[in-house]
Amino acid sequence: NETLKLIKKLNPENVILHDVFDGFSINHHELNDPFIQFKKENDGTNSLKDEIEVMLNGLEAFKDYNVSIVRSNHDDFLDRWLKNTDWRKANTMKNSIEYMEYSWLLLKNAAPNGIIPFLIRGKYPKMKTLNRNDSLIINGWEVAQHGDIGSNGSRGSLLQFRKLNTKIIVGHYHSPERKDGALSVGTSTKLRVNYNQGPSSWLHSHVIIHTDGKAQHINFLNGHFTTFK
């Protein structure tokens, strides 16, 4: 994994992660597509239990770092699924136990910041799980916002964020971009998924914040970073 190689090379004081949960198994955008649901049922990718396990196992590689996980829109997929789904009428029954367990957590207010942060903190108590209204500033850069939500609940964009009175780095757009003091990282996913049809600006890319406050994109081309060669 080239991202982990980069982290080991830099040994940063902080590691900021976005969208650690995809929500593919219960994606609300696909719940009414019978053909996608048929495929998921056949290949087993509609198992929420398995997807949660993959997420938690993936975070194992970061446990020795000072990790902060930004609340992201894909995290919301799970809470939205719990609110809007009647488990008795769901496309599959395999997620019924998770539905019951996670709903109980919400009912007794055990997971006020959402199910994904609750599960992460349960296994990795040293990792910080940031809420939507939290702030985390590193060397002058705000890094606690995902970028999907802007001022006063509006839709976020770099054009809007560049007007803030602080510099900011977000992670929602999957494409590296810079507009004055507003930066967006790229993605660590596959560059082609179901929903990014047509010409794409997606790129594997991270942002590093230097000790002097300068922020720099590190792009991965053909699966490798070349900045330090």
Language model region names:
Residues 140-224:
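Conserved beta-sheet core of the metallophosphoesterase superfamily
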